[in-house]
UniProtKB/Swiss-Prot annotation:
Compartment(s): Virion membrane; Host cell membrane
Membrane side Virion surface: residue ranges: 1-8
Family recorded in the similarity comment: Belongs to the rubulavirus small hydrophobic protein family.
Keyword line: Host cell membrane, Host membrane, Host-virus interaction, Inhibition of host NF-kappa-B by virus, Membrane, Transmembrane, Transmembrane helix, Virion
Main location: virion
GO terms (BP aspect): symbiont-mediated suppression of host NF-kappaB cascade
Ranges facing Intravirion side: 30-57
Protein's name according to its UniProt entry: Small hydrophobic protein
Cellular component aspect of the GO annotation: host cell plasma membrane; membrane; virion membrane
Subunit architecture: Interacts with host TNFRSF1A, RIPK1 and IRAK1; these interactions interfere with host NF-kappa-B activation at the level of receptor complexes. Interacts with host protein UBQLN4.
Keyword Transmembrane helix: yes
Function (record text): Plays a role in the inhibition of the host NF-kappa-B pathway. This inhibition occurs at the receptor level, by preventing the signaling of TNFR1 as well as IL-1R and TLR3.
Length: 57
């Protein structure tokens, strides 16, 4: 009976690896989008970004 049950440790390790890959992928995408957004804001939304920052405080 125990032979039918899949080993828990390798599946757990695979899950951790998968989650790490997913988090890294999301982090890279978010940083890239943030950098592009900041670049665009600094290019043609300088006054608007300053106004939003002043009103957010």
């Amino acid at each position: 009976m125990p032979a039918i049950q899949p080993p828990l440790y390798p599946t757990f390790l695979l899950l951790i690896l998968l989650s790490l890959i997913i988090t890294l992928y999301v982090w890279i995408i978010s940083t890239i989008t943030y950098k592009t957004a900041v670049r665009h804001a600094s290019l043609y939304q300088r006054s608007f970004s300053r106004w939003s920052f002043d009103h957010s405080l």
